[in-house]
UniProtKB/Swiss-Prot annotation:
InterPro entries: Bifun_inhib/LTP/seed_sf. It comes from Triticum aestivum (Wheat). GO terms for molecular function: lipid binding. Belongs to the plant LTP family. B11E subfamily. Disulfide bonds: none annotated. The lineage of its organism: Eukaryota, Viridiplantae, Streptophyta, Embryophyta, Tracheophyta. The keyword Cell wall biogenesis/degradation does not apply. This is Non-specific lipid-transfer protein 2. Binds specifically fatty acids. Possible structural role in association with these lipids. Keywords: Lipid-binding, Transport. The keyword Transport applies.
């Protein structure tokens, strides 16, 4: 399961133009 905080970090990375890392980010 992915935590909401982790998803927020992934979203921020995507919006920032960088490649998100972490198992949760791979599901986006």
């Amino acid at each position: 399961a992915c935590e909401v905080t982790q998803l927020a970090v992934c979203a921020s990375a995507i919006l920032g133009g960088t490649k998100p890392s972490g198992e949760c980010c791979g599901n986006l």
